[in-house]
Amino acid sequence: MENEFDVVVVGAGISGIGAGAHFNLKCPDQTYVILEGRESFGGTWDLFKYPGIRSDSDMHTLGYSFKPWVHKKSIANAPAIMEYLEETIDEYELHPHIRYNHHVETANWSPKEGKWIVSVTDKVNNKEIIFKGKLLYMCSGYYKYAHGYEPKFEGSENFEGQIVHPQKWSDDVEYENKEVVVIGSGATAATLVPELAKKTKHTTMLQRSPTYFVSAPDEDNLANNLRRFIPDRLAYFLIRIRNISFQQFFFKRARAYPEQAKERILNMVKEELPEDIVNKHFTPSYNPWDQRICLIPNSDFFESIKAKTSSVVTDHIEKFEEKGIRLKSGNFLPADLIVTATGLILESFGGVKMSVDNKPIEASDTYTSVSYTHLRAHETLD
C-alpha cells in the first residue's frame, strides 16, 4: 500500500533528520517516511526566532557523528545549524522521504497486523491520512510546540507595553531603544539579554534565584587549525572525542566534588565581574549540575553587564503595573517590553495519543522509573 512503510518517523527536526540519514546508511533496504507537522524541517532551530538564538553546546558534540561540523564557530547560531541540517537532507537524499504539514494525531499498535496504525492530519488538504509501519520512531522532541510555559502574573492585563514569550517571538516585537525586562535566568535568557542589550535602552534580567554560568570561546581554535592539515572528518572525530571526554570528566568530577566545582566556576565569574555582583546574582544555592549550567560564548553576557547595557536583579515579582514590574522588595522595574523566558512545557511523544490494541496508554504510567529524557527515541545529538 502507498502509505505502508517499515518505519514511520515522527518529526523532521535534528533527531528525525539524523534517523533518516542512519536508515539510508545502515538499512538501505528498509522503507521509511518522516512525518513533519510544520511546513519546514529543523524543529527547534526553525521554530524559535528570537534575537541571537544559538546552540549552548559546541557543535562538535551536538552535531551528527557521520557529518563533520566545519564552520569556524563551534557555538553556532540557528541559521548555521539550519544550513547544516539542509546539507544533511541533501547529502543523504532525504527530501523524498519527508512529508511536511503532516501532523500526527494518534498512534495505535495493532497486535493483529503487527504494525503501528498512525492517524495523520494533512494540514494542506485538511483531511485524515492513515500511515502504517512496523516500527514507530518518535523524534518529536520533548516540549509543546504550540506555546511555552507562561506563569500567570498578577496585573499582566494592566501592563501597557508588550509581553512576549521567546517561543512566540516575531518580527513585530519592538525592542530598540526600549526598557526591556527579561524574566528568567536559563539558557534562553542568557542568549537574549546580551543580544537585546546591543539595541535597547537597557535590558534587565529578572531572576528569582541565581544560575551557574560558564564562559567559553565560540570558536574552537584547535578544531579550526586541525582542518588545515588533516581531513575534515578526522579532525571532527578527534575534537568530538576530546570534547565529549572533557565534558564527561567535568560532570563526574563536579558531582563527586561539588564544593571544588562550585568554587572553580564562581572564581571564573569573579574574573569577569565584581565580587559583590557575583555573590548576589551569580552564586546559586545548589551544586553544579543539580540544574543545567548555562554557556556564555565569549563572555558576551558578562561584557554587557560591564558595559552597563544590561543588569541583573534577583527578586520576586509582586505584580505587573502599567509601566513595569513591582517587586516583592518594593522596588520597581520600568519596562516597555517584558520577555517571559520562563521555560517550556514538557510533552512526551509530541502530544501524540498512544494506544495498544486501541487501549490508551500514558507515558507517565509506563515510564515511572525512567528519566523523562529517555522518552526521546533518538538522542543523535548528545
Regions found by a protein language model. Name each.
Residues 75-138:
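Feature captures the FAD/FMN-dependent oxidoreductase FAD-binding
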